[in-house]
């Protein structure tokens, strides 16, 4: 089993990355744990072959982003694809911005962008929007876990970024370079660090932040810096992707690890429950720390949810 962390280049779709990974890794069985828009860069976690079975256990992971939000205008797609569709005065200062951001920690619902992959009645929202017949999208549950202002600039500036004990942030000296889309204008721009739950659209966050501040806003740049336990510092350039760059699955899975005896391992491979008093999901390994299965506990026993090994 193999997983790979790739730094998605600007302008490529997530599918473009998957296609290139298939070529470089010599396998058709390649997927990812969560898409990135073409105008976003950063961490795309790829799964291959047997590790594709891990996707249901990884797609709910929290994600960290650094977002560039430009104020005073908006676009149909809510990002820098353009064109500018509406402008509005941005009459607020840094203190107003700092006061608005913590309010997102109480937000529990979000209306997705009209240009999104959500399906309604078998039709993708972005397809309907491009046809001039936008769908009525209702609010969906979201979670904002951390929202932090990193900078407030007179225009989008591609600050370098670096990891820290408190998440990724702007680098004081040398850091990882950032590529932003072509600016749509010299609009005042906030750089915001976000940690969010699954299903959260950062483009919609930009729209909603603008509304909180009495203006229009759009996402002028985005870098994904973490997916669950994997940070952007572990990502390789797509041009450097090779089988040797794999990440061990135990570094990625978010569940407690339970090491089994040989007898217990045999029971797992037969799909039999184990009398181990654990709660929630756990990762089961053998004495050599090889992944055997993922199980779910009810406090009395473990029920096997997915077996990966063929022998113990």
Curated annotation (Swiss-Prot):
Single biological process term from Gene Ontology: mRNA pseudouridine synthesis
Alphabetized UniProt keyword annotations: Isomerase, tRNA processing
Reaction(s) catalysed (UniProt annotation): uridine(55) in tRNA = pseudouridine(55) in tRNA
Keyword Membrane: no
InterPro entries named among the record's database cross-references: PsdUridine_synth_cat_dom_sf (IPR020103), PsdUridine_synth_N (IPR002501), tRNA_psdUridine_synth_TruB (IPR014780)
Top-level enzyme category: isomerase
Pfam family, one: TruB_N
Cystine crosslinks: none
Molecular function (Gene Ontology), one example: tRNA pseudouridine(55) synthase activity
Enzyme Commission number, as recorded: 5.4.99.25
Keyword match Cytoplasm: no
Catalytic site positions: 37
Biological role: Responsible for synthesis of pseudouridine from uracil-55 in the psi GC loop of transfer RNAs.
HAMAP family, per database record: TruB_bact
Stated family: Belongs to the pseudouridine synthase TruB family. Type 1 subfamily.
Entry protein name: tRNA pseudouridine synthase B
Organism encoding this protein: Thermus thermophilus (strain ATCC 27634 / DSM 579 / HB8)
């Amino acid at each position: 089993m193999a997983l790979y962390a790739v730094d998605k280049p600007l302008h490529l779709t997530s599918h473009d990355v998957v296609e290139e990974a298939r070529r470089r890794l010599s396998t058709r069985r390649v997927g990812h744990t969560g898409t990135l828009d073409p105008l976003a860069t950063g961490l795309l976690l790829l799964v291959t072959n047997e590790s594709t079975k891990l996707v249901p256990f990884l797609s709910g992971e929290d994600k960290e982003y650094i977002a560039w939000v430009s104020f005073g205008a908006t676009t149909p797609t809510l990002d820098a694809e353009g064109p500018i569709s509406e402008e509005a005065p941005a009459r607020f200062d840094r203190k107003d911005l700092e006061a608005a951001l913590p309010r997102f920690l109480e937000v529990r619902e979000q209306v997705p962008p009209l240009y999104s992959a959500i399906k309604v009645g078998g039709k993708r929202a972005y397809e309907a929007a491009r046809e001039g017949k936008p769908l009525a999208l209702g609010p969906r549950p979201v979670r904002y876990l951390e929202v932090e202002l990193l900078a407030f600039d007179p225009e989008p500036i591609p600050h370098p970024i670096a990891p820290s004990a408190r998440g990724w942030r702007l680098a004081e000296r040398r850091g990882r370079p950032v590529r932003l889309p072509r600016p749509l204008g010299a609009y005042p721009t906030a750089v915001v660090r976000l940690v969010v739950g699954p299903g959260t659209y950062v483009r919609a966050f930009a729209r909603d932040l603008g509304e909180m501040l009495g203006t229009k806003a759009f996402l002028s740049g985005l870098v994904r810096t973490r997916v669950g336990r994997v940070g952007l510092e572990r990502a390789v350039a797509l041009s450097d992707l090779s089988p040797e760059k794999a990440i061990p699955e135990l570094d990625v899975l978010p569940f407690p690890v339970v090491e089994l005896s040989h007898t217990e391992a045999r029971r797992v491979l037969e799909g039999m429950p184990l009398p181990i008093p654990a709660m929630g999901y756990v990762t089961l390994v053998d004495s050599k720390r090889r992944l055997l299965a993922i199980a779910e506990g009810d406090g009395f026993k473990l029920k096997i949810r997915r077996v990966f090994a063929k022998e113990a």
